[in-house]
């Protein structure tokens, strides 16, 4: 089943890649283009007109709306949960607008958010979204300080990510580790069984919560070694990769979920 899943994922990515518009075909400022465009969309732009119609219905239903967006491969804000939490307290409805990777000629995506944003700015001013995002970020920072918020390593800029301490020096982490097992593992060319291990880099640079996130045997006969290989992977990380310079978010020390892929030979 996992082989089928990864094959499907690869095909999906390639399909999306084929359908993405070249950069030079995009408007110079998509945000401002949409704000102007929704006021007078092309009559044949069914996608945009449907989005505008839905936005108008939601504006009748909810007094205040904050629109989030999501798409395959899009980066999520580290304080996305706090936006929802803050918005609920302020009686602001959070609605997620999902963008498809498929581009249809003459059809425009993003009109729903543009329409809602325009209306909210008319009522609350140009900084409507900024105020919500700033409040949510401050809420997240408070959680970071108390240790109740764990950020992903991918939420941080490169200079703020945890750095591995080796021989009393800070080094960049190796994304893929290799363990020589001595076991009769089945493999093909450079394809070996692997396991994705996650762990938390604490504020004091130690690690905790080491766990298996994903196991790929490569071949059925390797399944019987799963528990043994998982133990080897965790032991290697706990032994050789347990000292870190902790991560930071805007100069605030934070707990960070990090990860390694461990391959077995």
Predicted regions and their residues:
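Bacterial Sec-dependent N-terminal signal peptides
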Residues: 1-31
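Charge-biased low-complexity segments
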Residues: 22-265
């Amino acid at each position: 089943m996992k082989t089928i899943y990864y094959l499907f994922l690869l095909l999906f990515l390639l399909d999306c890649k084929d359908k993405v518009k070249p950069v030079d075909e995009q408007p110079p400022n998509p945000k401002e283009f949409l704000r102007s465009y929704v006021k007078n969309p092309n009559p044949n732009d069914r996608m945009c007109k449907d989005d505008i119609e839905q936005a108008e219905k939601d504006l009748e239903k909810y007094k205040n709306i904050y629109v989030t967006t999501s798409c395959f491969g899009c980066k999520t804000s580290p304080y996305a949960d706090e936006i929802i939490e803050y918005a609920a307290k302020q009686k602001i409805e959070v609605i997620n607008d999902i963008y498809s990777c498929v581009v249809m000629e003459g059809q425009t995506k993003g009109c729903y958010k543009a329409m809602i944003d325009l209306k909210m700015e008319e009522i609350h001013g140009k900084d409507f979204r900024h105020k919500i995002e700033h409040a949510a970020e401050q809420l997240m920072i408070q959680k970071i300080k108390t240790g109740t918020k764990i950020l992903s390593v991918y939420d941080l800029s490169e200079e703020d990510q945890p750095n591995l301490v080796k021989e009393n020096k800070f080094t960049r982490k190796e994304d893929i580790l290799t363990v020589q097992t001595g076991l009769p593992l089945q493999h093909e060319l450079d394809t070996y069984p692997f396991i994705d291990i996650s762990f938390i880099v604490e504020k004091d640079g130690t690690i905790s919560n080491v766990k298996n996130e994903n196991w790929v045997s490569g071949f059925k006969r390797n399944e019987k070694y799963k528990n043994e290989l998982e133990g080897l992977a965790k032991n290697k990380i706990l032994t050789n990769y347990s000292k870190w310079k902790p991560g930071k978010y805007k100069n605030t020390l934070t707990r960070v979920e990090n990860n390694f892929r461990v391959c077995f030979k």
